[in-house]
C-alpha cells in the first residue's frame, strides 16, 4: 500500500500544502509524482494532467460569476446595511454575555445557511461569497476565530448530505449509495433502502456534530484578533454611507438574489443564475453596463485562486484515475492478508479517505469501492447496516479537510476576502481534524456494533 501512487501522491500533496507551498503547485507536483510512480511516464502524465483540466473549467467559471455577483451586491449597499444593523445592535448591548450569545447566533445562522444549501435550497457553496464577506467586519469586532466559522460552514456542507435524503442528499443516498450497494449486493443477498442508509449514517454524523461542538466551544473558543491593514469604517462612516442608499437599491438586491437562486434551482446552472442576477442589477441601475467589465475583473480577482485550484484538482484527479492506483488500493483489501474484523474496517475507511482526497469527490468514490467493499464486508461478517456505514463513511471521508474540495474551498472563498484567512491552515487543517477524525472513530464504532 505504501508504494501505491495514490497514497504517495496524497502524502506529497498534504506535505507540500502544510509547508505553505501554493496549492496549485502542490497539485501539479503531486500529479507528476503519481504519474511517475504509476509508470505513466513524463509525457503521458503531462498529457493526462492537461487533458483533465477542462473538467474543472465549469466550476472555475461558476466561481468567477459568483465573484462578480458578490461585487455587484456590495455595490448595491445591502451588505453595508446589514453590517450597520448588526453593529448598532452590538453597540447598544456591548456586555460580554450578549456578545457571546450573539457570536453563537451568527454560527447558528451560518450553519442553517450551509445545511439549506445542501438540502432545502441545493445551491451548494454559491451562498458563501454572498453571505460571508459582509460579516467579516462583524467577525473582527467580535474577535471571532475564522477557523470556527470554516468548521461551521464545512459541517453544513458535508454532514447533511450523507444523512438527509433531500436535495444533494437525495442524489448521494438514493441515486448513488443505495443504487451501488444494491447492485454489488444483488447476488449476495444484500439489499438496502434510503431509510436504512440514513440510520446507518446517524452515528458517524453524531461524531461530526461532536467535532463541530469541539471546534466552537473548545478549540477555537478564544478571541482571535486579525491584523487588518485597512482601517475599518466606524459606525459614523457607515451611517453616512447608509444615508445614500435608496430603497430601490435594497429591493433590487433582494430581487436579484432571489432570482439568482431560483434560476440556479430551475436550470441547475450557477452561471446562468449569476448572469440573471447581474442583468437585474444593470436594469435597476445599481451599476451601469459600461462598468460591467470592472465588476467582472474584480470578481475574477476575488475568486481566481479558488477557480484555478479546482482546475488543477481536476487534472490531478485525471492522473490518479489514469494509474492503476485506485483499483490496486481497493483490491489490496481483498487479498486475504487482513484477518481481523476491526483492522479490516479501519483499513477500508482509511482507503476511502485516500481515494476521496485523490479524486476530489465523495460522490465518485462510491462506485469505485462498492464492488469490492460489499462482498468484503459480508465475508467478514459485518451486518447490512455496518456494511452501509463502512461504504458511506469511506466515501464521505476526505470531503472535509481536502485542499481541493468544495467543502474547504467554499469557506475560504468567503473568509479570505481580506486576505486574512489561510486556506490550508485555517480551513483544511481545522476541518480535517474536527471531521475526518470523528468520522473515522464513529464510522469504525458503527461498523463494529451496528
From Swiss-Prot:
Its main location: membrane. Pfam families: Na_H_antiport_2 (PF13726), Na_H_antiporter (PF03553). The keyword DNA repair does not apply. It is a multi-pass membrane protein. The chain crosses the membrane at residues 10-30, 53-73, 95-115, 120-140, 148-168, 199-219, 242-262, 267-287, 302-322, 343-363, 378-398, 428-448. GO terms for cellular component: plasma membrane. Keywords: Cell membrane, Membrane, Transmembrane, Transmembrane helix. It is found in: Cell membrane. InterPro entries: AA_Transporter-Related, Na/H_Antiport_NhaC-like_C, Na_H_antiport_N. PANTHER family: AMINO ACID TRANSPORTER YUIF-RELATED. This is Uncharacterized membrane protein HI_0325. It comes from Haemophilus influenzae (strain ATCC 51907 / DSM 11121 / KW20 / Rd).
Amino acid at each position: 500500500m505504501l508504494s501505491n501512487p495514490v497514497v504517495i501522491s496524497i502524502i506529497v500533496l498534504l506535505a507540500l500544502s502544510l509547508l505553505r507551498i501554493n496549492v496549485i503547485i502542490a497539485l501539479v507536483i503531486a500529479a507528476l509524482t503519481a504519474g511517475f510512480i504509476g509508470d505513466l511516464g513524463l509525457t503521458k502524465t503531462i498529457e493526462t494532467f492537461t487533458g483533465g483540466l477542462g473538467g474543472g473549467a465549469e466550476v472555475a467559471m461558476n466561481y468567477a460569476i459568483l465573484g462578480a455577483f458578490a461585487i455587484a451586491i456590495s455595490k448595491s449597499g445591502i451588505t453595508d446595511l446589514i453590517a450597520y444593523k448588526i453593529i448598532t445592535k452590538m453597540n447598544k448591548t456591548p456586555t460580554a454575555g450578549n456578545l457571546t450569545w450573539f457570536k453563537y447566533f451568527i454560527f447558528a445562522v451560518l450553519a442553517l445557511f450551509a445545511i439549506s444549501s445542501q438540502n432545502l435550497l441545493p445551491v451548494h457553496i454559491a451562498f458563501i461569497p454572498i453571505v460571508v464577506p459582509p460579516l467579516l467586519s462583524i467577525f473582527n469586532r467580535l474577535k471571532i476565530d475564522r477557523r470556527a466559522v470554516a468548521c461551521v460552514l464545512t459541517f453544513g456542507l458535508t454532514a447533511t448530505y450523507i444523512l438527509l435524503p433531500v436535495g444533494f442528499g437525495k442524489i448521494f443516498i438514493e441515486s448513488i449509495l443505495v443504487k451501488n450497494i444494491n447492485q454489488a449486493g444483488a447476488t449476495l443477498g444484500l439489499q438496502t433502502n434510503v431509510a436504512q442508509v440514513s440510520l446507518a449514517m446517524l452515528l458517524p454524523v453524531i461524531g461530526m456534530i461532536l467535532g463541530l461542538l469541539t471546534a466552537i466551544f473548545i478549540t477555537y473558543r478564544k478571541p482571535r484578533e486579525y491584523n487588518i491593514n485597512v482601517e475599518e469604517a466606524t459606525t459614523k462612516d457607515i451611517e453616512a454611507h447608509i444615508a445614500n442608499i435608496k430603497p430601490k437599491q435594497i429591493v433590487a438586491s433582494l430581487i436579484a438574489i432571489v432570482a439568482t437562486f431560483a434560476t440556479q434551482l430551475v436550470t441547475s446552472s450557477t452561471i446562468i443564475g449569476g448572469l440573471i442576477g447581474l442583468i437585474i442589477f444593470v436594469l435597476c441601475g445599481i451599476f451601469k453596463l459600461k462598468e460591467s467589465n470592472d465588476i467582472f475583473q474584480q470578481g475574477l480577482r476575488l475568486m481566481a485562486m479558488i477557480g484555478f485550484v479546482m482546475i488543477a484538482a481536476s487534472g490531478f484527479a485525471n492522473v490518479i484515475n489514469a494509474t492503476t492506483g485506485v483499483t490496486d488500493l481497493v483490491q489490496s483489501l481483498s487479498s486475504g492478508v487482513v484477518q481481523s474484523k476491526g483492522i479490516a474496517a479501519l483499513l477500508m475507511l482509511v482507503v476511502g479517505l485516500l481515494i476521496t482526497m485523490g479524486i476530489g469527490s465523495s460522490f465518485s468514490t462510491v462506485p469505485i469501492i462498492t464492488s469490492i467493499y460489499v462482498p468484503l464486508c459480508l465475508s467478514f461478517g459485518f451486518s447490512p447496516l455496518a456494511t452501509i456505514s463502512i461504504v458511506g463513511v469511506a466515501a464521505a471521508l476526505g470531503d472535509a479537510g481536502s485542499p481541493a474540495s468544495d467543502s474547504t474551498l467554499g469557506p475560504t472563498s468567503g473568509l479570505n476576502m481580506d486576505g486574512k484567512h489561510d486556506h490550508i491552515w485555517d480551513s483544511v487543517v481545522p476541518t480535517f481534524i474536527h471531521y475526518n477524525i470523528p468520522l473515522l472513530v464513529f464510522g469504525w464504532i458503527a461498523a463494529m456494533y451496528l
